[in-house]
């Protein structure tokens, strides 16, 4: 099984690679359909997670995913996307929404991080003491495009 992570930020894709993701694609430079075809060949892909929250993203997924597959919408959309419901039905696509995680999800994540299967260190951009919370938020404001997670130690 292969996983393709997409983004419009080369910085974020580099962080994904440091976390162990092998296949990444900057969809601002290469269309999803072209990148997915290169990776998956004629089989396309059978599952997708929409986490961007923009109409063009979910439309691209619908156009590229294999017939009868599932798209899980994790993102919170800023405005209601317009989707081609005829295409959705004709291609037997399933669109599932999700808002919260279940207790079992946390247990699985803890096991995967503890075993080393998932590397989180590359996601951490900086550390601050609790007393430095103003400085931490200033850092976030000034470095939003090149930072991921900021740790504030209690």
Task: Describe the predicted segments one by one.
Residues 1-60:
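Adenosine-nucleotide cofactor-binding segment
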Residues 8-9, 77, 101:
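Residues in the short beta-alpha loop(s) of Rossmann-like NAD(P)-binding domains
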Residues 10, 59-63, 103-154:
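C-terminal hydrophobic helical "lid"/dimerization subdomain
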Residues 47, 70-72:
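Conserved catalytic-site loops of classical short-chain dehydrogenases/reductases
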Residues 65-67:
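Helix-to-beta-strand junctions that scaffold the AdoMet/dcAdoMet cofactor pocket
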Residues 69-70, 94:
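Short glycine-centered segments of the SAM/dcSAM-binding site in methyltransferase folds
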Residues 75-93, 104-111:
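Rossmann-fold NAD(P)-binding glycine/threonine-rich loop
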């Amino acid at each position: 099984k292969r996983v393709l992570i997409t983004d419009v930020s080369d910085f974020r894709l580099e962080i994904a690679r440091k976390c162990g993701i092998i296949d990444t694609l900057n969809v601002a430079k290469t269309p999803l359909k072209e990148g997915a075809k290169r990776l998956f060949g004629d089989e396309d892909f059978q599952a997708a997670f929409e986490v961007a929250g923009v109409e063009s993203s979910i439309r691209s997924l619908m156009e590229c995913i294999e017939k009868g597959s599932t798209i899980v919408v994790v993102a919170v959309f800023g405005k209601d996307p317009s989707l081609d419901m005829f295409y959705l039905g004709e291609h037997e696509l399933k669109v599932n929404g999700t808002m919260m995680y279940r207790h079992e999800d946390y247990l699985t994540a803890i096991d995967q991080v503890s075993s080393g299967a998932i590397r989180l260190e590359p996601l951490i951009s900086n550390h601050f003491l609790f007393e430095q919370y103003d400085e931490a938020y200033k850092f976030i404001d000034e470095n939003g495009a090149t930072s991921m997670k900021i740790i504030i130690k209690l």
